[in-house]
């Protein structure tokens, strides 16, 4: 009886171990941690230009003046660790200084922000091992659309939410809405990763695989955010070493960790599709045998 149970358990866990082995092999072959380091470097270089371009768009639309403040607080509260307030203060100072730049400097900011999107595109297509390249004009149009429409859609979403909450009939739903808002960062991360894994690669990505990979990445991102914040508050020894410069390594480590999670979700998505193909090929060979 015990042997039968062990055989069943071994038979059920064998596909999982095979998939994990395939996942580890792909992570090693793609040099995932090196790609994450490259993206972290480009992200830090592009962070201030990207934020400057986004909030310059909000400034161009007076109707989004209040929403931009809400969106800014939401981003720093939910996508940065416990030191987000310090990082926010520095970034806002940098953005305020960037507003004094000339037209040539503003073009440089836009190019630097687009550089980050190009790096993300290149890294994900490296993981998917896609040889097909998009036309340059099409890629630029997609990057520009994301850079301009993305913040405006996020601002419109927050504006609509604020308006609905201000209505009298919604007052009785505040408790339900509060509970929904608790998981809103997780849902937002899930949707963002799903869109990233579905749209950016130049080859077709199965929707089911993208949803699973995005969900794992969203869970790891939320867990990593809370774990990183806990480490910073419980073990503040880094402040003794770096002093006032402590925010620099904290931001770099967090950005690097975030890109590791994003790329891991991409690797999971790719490996799921690859594993299904290998499994179907093995089953086909068994059916063809006499």
Curated annotation (Swiss-Prot):
Domain of life of the native organism: Bacteria
Membrane topology: Multi-pass membrane protein
Predominant location: membrane
Keyword Transmembrane: yes
Chain segments annotated as transmembrane: 44-64, 104-124, 140-160, 183-203, 210-230, 244-264
Annotated localization: Cell inner membrane
UniProt key word Transmembrane: yes
Alphabetical UniProt keywords: Cell inner membrane, Cell membrane, Membrane, Transmembrane, Transmembrane helix
Entry GO CC: plasma membrane
Region forming the signal peptide: none
Family recorded in the similarity comment: Belongs to the UPF0761 family.
NCBIfam families noted in UniProt: PRK01637.1 (NF002457), yihY_not_rbn (TIGR00765)
Protein name: UPF0761 membrane protein YihY
Organism, as annotated: Shigella boydii serotype 4 (strain Sb227)
Gene: yihY
């Amino acid at each position: 009886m015990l042997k039968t149970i062990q055989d069943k358990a071994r038979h059920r866990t064998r596909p999982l171990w095979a998939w994990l082995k395939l996942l580890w092999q792909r992570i090693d072959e793609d040099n995932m941690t090196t790609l994450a380091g490259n993206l972290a470097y480009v992200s830090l270089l592009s962070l201030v230009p990207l934020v400057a371009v986004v909030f310059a768009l909000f400034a161009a639309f007076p109707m989004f003046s209040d929403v931009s403040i809400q969106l800014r607080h939401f981003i720093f509260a939910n996508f940065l660790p416990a030191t987000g307030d310090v990082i926010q203060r520095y970034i806002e100072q940098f953005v305020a200084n960037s507003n004094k730049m000339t037209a040539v400097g503003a073009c440089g900011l836009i190019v630097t922000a687009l550089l980050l999107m190009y790096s993300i595109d290149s890294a994900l297509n490296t993981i998917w091992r896609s040889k097909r390249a998009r036309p340059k004009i099409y890629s630029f149009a997609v990057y520009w659309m994301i850079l301009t429409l993305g913040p405006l859609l996020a601002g419109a979403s927050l504006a609509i939410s604020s308006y609905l909450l201000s209505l009298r009939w919604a007052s009785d739903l505040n408790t339900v809405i509060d509970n929904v808002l608790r998981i809103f960062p997780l849902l937002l991360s899930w949707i963002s990763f799903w869109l990233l894994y579905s749209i950016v690669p130049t080859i077709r990505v199965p929707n089911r695989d993208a949803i699973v990979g995005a969900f794992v990445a969203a869970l790891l991102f939320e867990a990593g955010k809370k774990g990183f914040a806990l480490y910073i508050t419980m073990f503040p020894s880094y402040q003794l070493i770096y002093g006032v410069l402590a925010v620099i390594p904290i931001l770099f480590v967090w950005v690097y960790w975030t890109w590791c999670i994003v790329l891991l979700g991409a690797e999971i998505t790719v490996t799921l599709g690859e594993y299904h193909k290998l499994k179907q090929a093995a089953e086909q060979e068994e059916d063809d045998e006499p």
